[in-house]
Design a protein with these regions (language model features):
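Generic structural signal for short, flexible, solvent-exposed coil/loop and linker residues
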Residues: 2, 6, 47, 59-62, ...
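Sequence/structural segment immediately N-terminal to covalent heme-attachment motifs in c-type
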Residues: 37-64, 76-77
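Hydrophobic packing within well-folded, soluble alpha/beta domains
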Residues: 25, 55-58, 113
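Axial heme c-ligation environment in periplasmic c-type cytochrome domains
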Residues: 1-22, 29-32, 37-42, 67-72, ...
């Protein structure tokens, strides 16, 4: 709601929500069953793993972030992850760290990274 994260759809939707509304939505989403993603193309997964070294610094070796406010990548939809990387590169989504991460990534590298992270098990966070 602060407007720090720019998204035309979500900024408009969140503007009218109270803190209680947001808490209720978060609880509802947290209670939904995890859908196991397709393991994807093995060649793309391997390429993604080879390119993910820089990603591991923030998102962890298994796609679980080192900071609680950063997103879990493990098990996310490949299409969603690919779209988010493209949005960071085009400037339609902004995060100060991600701008530098994606600036030299080609679309094929984004697809490979998305394929790698989608096949990781996102059903339960590591203990």
């Amino acid at each position: 709601r602060s407007g720090e994260r720019k998204n035309v759809v979500m900024n408009g939707m969140a503007a009218g929500l109270t803190d209680a509304d947001i808490d209720e939505l978060a609880d509802w989403y947290a209670g939904q069953p995890w859908v196991i993603a397709d393991n994807g193309n093995p060649n793309l997964v391997e390429e993604g793993l080879n390119r993910a070294g820089y990603c591991h610094a923030c998102h962890g070796m298994k796609g679980y972030p080192v900071a609680k406010d950063w997103p879990i990548l493990a098990g996310q939809s490949a299409l969603y992850l690919d779209n988010q990387l493209q949005a960071f590169k085009s400037g339609t989504r902004y995060h100060p760290h991600m701008v530098n991460v994606v600036k030299d990534l080609e679309p094929s590298a984004m697809t490979a990274l998305a394929s790698y992270y989608t096949q990781l098990n996102g059903a339960a966070a590591p203990q």
